[in-house]
Amino acid sequence: MISKINFVKMHGLGNDFVVVNKRDLSSSYDLSQLAKNMADRHTGIGCDQFIIYEEHDDFYEMIIYNIDGSSAKLCGNATRCLAKLIYLDTGKKDITVMVGNKKLLCNVEDENNISVNVGKVSFNEVWMPSRDKIWELAERYMIDLKETICVDIGNPHLVIFSKLEPQDQKIVGEKLQAKELFADGVNVNFAEVKDNKIYLSVWERGAGLTLACGSGACGSFAAGLKLGFIHSPSTVVFKYGSLTMKEENGNIIMQGAATLVARGEYYCEQ
């Protein structure tokens, strides 16, 4: 039997998503498999992550799947996209999004300026692998471990303040997913600082290198503040645009654009 699913295609600075309202999904769907199918760029719609949302009385719940069908704990760009979608559909400007137990406060200033308060981050050494385990990688790719830091922003990020070529970013990103290094994988941020701006590339666990990463921007901004490389406010620059970052009372706030690409129907065999 073939069923129809309404979807929205959106992107934040090139980081793209297929977004579906939970009310349009049958309870019989295997959501992990559906995510893999719809995310496929050859046989599906194509995206970096698959987003399901549900409206509640005073917040919207967001569930995130990676292209490999695994779940993700946070996505800053997807949050901005969802906030814009809700604004376009309802006119609401102040929107609360829940991802798991993480509350994200969003404000739509206009269609091209959406801010998300992601709250406080922690610099969590608990899941940092022992230095000797990554010494070989650091030595081979000239990574300064004194300028490498773990940030937990609701999902785990390893921020490396060293310039690596794209082909080396791919290799290092893949190698750091090894279970003996990070049991659940890790998002790897390659950050370069110039004139109080962070130029960022991110290897996302479950997705690989993406054109932009909102949570990576937040984590890298927080890491840059802690290490004294930048001050607030700052800008995080990606290939297709930038995010404005600031810190207020310990909370990290990002602001940037989100783009609606298309609305359509996906036909699913059950």
UniProtKB/Swiss-Prot annotation:
Its main location: cytoplasm. One of its GO terms (molecular function) is diaminopimelate epimerase activity. The active site is at 75 (proton donor), 213 (proton acceptor). GO terms for cellular component: cytosol. InterPro entries: DAP_epimerase_AS, DAP_epimerase_DapF. One of its GO terms (biological process) is lysine biosynthetic process via diaminopimelate. SUPFAM superfamilies: Diaminopimelate epimerase-like. Keywords: Amino-acid biosynthesis, Cytoplasm, Isomerase, Lysine biosynthesis. It is found in: Cytoplasm. Its EC number is 5.1.1.7. Pfam families: DAP_epimerase. The record marks 157, 204 as: Could be important to modulate the pK values of the two catalytic cysteine residues. Pathway: Amino-acid biosynthesis; L-lysine biosynthesis via DAP pathway; DL-2,6-diaminopimelate from LL-2,6-diaminopimelate: step 1/1. The keyword Glycosyltransferase does not apply. Substrate binds at residues 15, 49, 66, 76-77, 155, 187, 204-205, 214-215. It catalyses: (2S,6S)-2,6-diaminopimelate = meso-2,6-diaminopimelate. Gene3D superfamilies: Diaminopimelate Epimerase, Chain A, domain 1. Catalyzes the stereoinversion of LL-2,6-diaminopimelate (L,L-DAP) to meso-diaminopimelate (meso-DAP), a precursor of L-lysine and an essential component of the bacterial peptidoglycan. Homodimer. HAMAP family: DAP_epimerase. Belongs to the diaminopimelate epimerase family. NCBIfam families: DapF (TIGR00652). This is Diaminopimelate epimerase. It comes from Rickettsia felis (strain ATCC VR-1525 / URRWXCal2) (Rickettsia azadi). The lineage of its organism: Bacteria, Pseudomonadati, Pseudomonadota, Alphaproteobacteria, Rickettsiales. The gene is dapF.
